[in-house]
């Protein structure tokens, strides 16, 4: 919730009154909170490879296991193990190293804090209050968020549609780049 408020405050400071909003993974949780708090400012919402539950059912490992792996194996090893689940081709994916490099930009404490925030968050009850036109994007090989998470979003957000990308994992935008970009632009540009 504090990240949601921080972003909303920044937008307010920059005098951005209305905007489209896309959230990927944990960012999807943040945009759900932003929409709950200031939905009138959001033109269209995109919930991408995310869900309404932080303790993600069907995730490749529990959040507690990720925290334990972080402590035992360190940030570098944990980041590698998690990032390889984000691609169908794992470590052989074209943009795998981009994710690893991004992971190097954080600290052990920040990584652990994000996992704690993940685990303790549940936005299911707030979904019915999201009235914004919403696109839900999910890859059929996603090991972080299963289909039930995407379906829960679709079922509980009244003005939503779900698009499933076949042959993609958690990072659809890095596996089917053109198709992903076209899908997002079409959603934003069409009434």
Predicted feature residues:
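Active-site loop/oxyanion-hole signature of alpha/beta-hydrolase fold enzymes
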Residues: 1-22, 182
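Conserved alpha/beta-hydrolase catalytic His-Asp/Glu region
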Residues: 55-61, 72-128
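Short beta-strand/loop motif that positions the catalytic acidic residue
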Residues: 130, 136-138, 142
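Conserved alpha/beta-hydrolase "acid-adjacent" motif
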Residues: 143-149
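Catalytic active-site module of serine/aspartate enzymes centered on a nucleophile-bearing elbow/loop
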Residues: 160-191
